[in-house]
């Protein structure tokens, strides 16, 4: 294969998800875009499940570059993949996101229309997926964002830069300094803020579809919003962005249940833990008896409570989070 013919590099970090990775690779082999024109860079982040043996032996119609590293997190793995990429464009695709046949072609079409773009594809719920209730909630919230962007309720921004399915010029990643390897979660959003300062255009691409075979434990799901909350404050502080102002305004727009729960339970460790345990069991019961949609408001409340606790902890406590206007809004809920 002539390396000069490669126009786009698919970069996929992976960690002990061989079965899912095999499905992703099979879908990449079935792309409508010529396999001579793209490569796939797999970065194993310390996998111990046979990923290395499989990737080193499998034959694919495209160039497959396999890289093994000690476990260092997804940011480090993506940086390693970008460094090895030969294409002028980089497409980040997670190891549990199965691409539709035209995914690569659709990303490329939008880049050909205009340079300096970040193309944001979708991570849709697969019709054959059996998701945990909290993961089903997460997917529902993601697809709610997609509908909002499609209908013009809001434009695509740095906050929708999810590296499960997104593409941009390799030189833009390098110019922004790559992923910050200190962060194990939301490292994609942090990079997006730096990309935004370079004047890139974020564009939503609903036709660049991927199917997200998501799986995570409830304990992992519960930790995620807390880290997001802390990271939002860290990102704002380090990049001199008024994210706390954004977070407070967003809080004021939350529903009454969420605002009341946060007002009552923020920084109340024992009470908060009890409430989370009760809400978790109630959500499972409602999901089982009444169906997935009935549990969504409860999972939203759990997620938001954990997120705002992360915000408050990074700020130094609830008093630092609740400004006068926020206090009034919460007590009126």
Task: Please identify what each model-predicted range represents.
Residues 102-135, 213:
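Conserved donor NDP-sugar-binding/catalytic core segment of glycosyltransferases
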Residues 1-30:
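N-proximal low-complexity "stem/linker" segments adjacent to membrane-targeting elements
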Residues 69-85:
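Glycine-rich, basic loop-to-helix element that forms the pyrophosphate-binding segment
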């Amino acid at each position: 294969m002539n390396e000069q013919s490669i126009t786009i590099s698919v970069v996929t970090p992976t960690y002990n998800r061989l079965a899912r990775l095999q499905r992703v690779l099979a879908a990449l082999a079935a792309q409508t875009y010529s396999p001579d024109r793209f490569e796939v860079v797999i970065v194993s982040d310390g996998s111990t499940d046979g990923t290395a043996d499989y990737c080193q032996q499998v034959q694919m119609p495209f160039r497959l570059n396999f890289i093994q590293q000690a476990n260092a997190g997804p940011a480090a793995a993506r940086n390693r993949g970008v460094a090895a990429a030969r294409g002028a464009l980089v497409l980040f695709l997670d190891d549990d996101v199965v691409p539709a046949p035209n995914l690569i072609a659709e990303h490329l079409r939008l880049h050909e229309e205009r340079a300096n773009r970040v193309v944001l594809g979708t991570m849709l719920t697969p019709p054959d997926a059996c998701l945990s209730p909290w993961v089903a909630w997460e997917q529902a919230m993601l697809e709610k964002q997609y509908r909002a962007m499609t209908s013009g309720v809001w434009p695509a921004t740095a906050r929708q830069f999810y590296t499960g399915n997104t593409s941009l010029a390799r030189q833009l990643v390098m110019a922004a300094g790559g992923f910050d390897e200190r962060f194990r979660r939301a490292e994609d959003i942090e990079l997006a803020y730096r990309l935004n300062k370079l004047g890139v255009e974020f564009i939503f691409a609903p036709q660049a579809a991927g199917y997200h075979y998501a799986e995570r434990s409830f304990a992992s799901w519960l930790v995620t919003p807390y880290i997001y909350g802390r990271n939002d404050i860290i990102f704002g502080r380090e990049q001199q962005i008024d994210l706390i102002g954004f977070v407070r305004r967003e809080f004021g727009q939350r529903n009454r249940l969420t605002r009341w729960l946060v007002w009552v339970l923020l920084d109340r460790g024992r009470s908060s833990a009890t409430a989370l345990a009760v809400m978790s069991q109630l959500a499972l019961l409602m999901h089982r008896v009444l169906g997935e949609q009935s549990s969504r408001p409860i999972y939203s409340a759990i997620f938001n409570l954990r997120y705002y606790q992360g915000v408050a902890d990074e700020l130094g406590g609830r008093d630092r989070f609740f400004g006068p206007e926020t206090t009034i809004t919460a007590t009126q809920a």
